[in-house]
Amino acid sequence: VVYQIYPRSFADSNHDGIGDLGGVRDRLGHLTWLGVDAIWLSPFYRSPMADFGYDVADYCDVDPLFGALDDIDGLIADAHALGIRLVLDWVPNHTSEQHPWFVELRRGTADPKREWYVWRDPSPSGGPPNNWRAAFAPVPAWTLDPTTSQYYLHCFLPQQPDLD
């Protein structure tokens, strides 16, 4: 049995009104009682929260809303001790516009790592490269970066540039 948990709304261990990793850890006994074999844990990485954590700014850190690295380490250890596996919801499609990679690549077009994201020149009319629309918003899937004068692709929010 796989049980998906969105930490923000699952359980709040520090009484700040926001669910956190400590809250998940506190409820492991209940999940064991339910017969859960694995937890699918929605994003808890450092994020500006434009899309509730799916706009990851740092894949190697825990957002302070949810706790700290020690909290995820403890959750993993306790879950494994109870025979529960964790599946971490990793977002490989895009990052936050505040991710260091994207921030660096907005400075210019000469960096060879620029191909890590999808960049295109404007169309001959000066607009977006094509008429694609973002999935969740009634906006184009392209946003013009004023520094480089190129558009970047975002299939979701403009704050979530797509990785190539």
What kind of feature is each model-predicted range?
Residues 1-164:
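Acidic/aromatic-lined carbohydrate-recognition and catalytic surfaces
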